Amino acid sequence: MGKQLELFETTASFDVLIENVAGWAKDKGIDKKENAPKQLLKVLEEVGETAGALLKSKDEEIKDGIGDSFVTIIILAKQLGLEPAECLEAAWNEIKDRTGKTENGVFIKN
């Protein structure tokens, strides 16, 4: 039962963070659907910065990059009228029973 409680507490704080990010985006005036193409570029920029940090083995920059990537994806989802948690749940439901094999540290689906 402890793991379920931890998951619930983590999920609850993740939900709060999502709403904080959405509120921040609204305050900055970047919450509108017409901004989605520009926001997608921000997502790609942050993922690219994360890749650069990973290649340099810079742990703090990796953590920052992953966090920034989350933020930009949350904003993009909200701009498109999507709930980030629902997007994650849909992806999880798609992959949870997926079969395949792992080669060189990468999972390859059947």
Predicted regions located by residue number:
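Flexible "arm" and connector segments at domain edges
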Residues: 1-66, 70-110
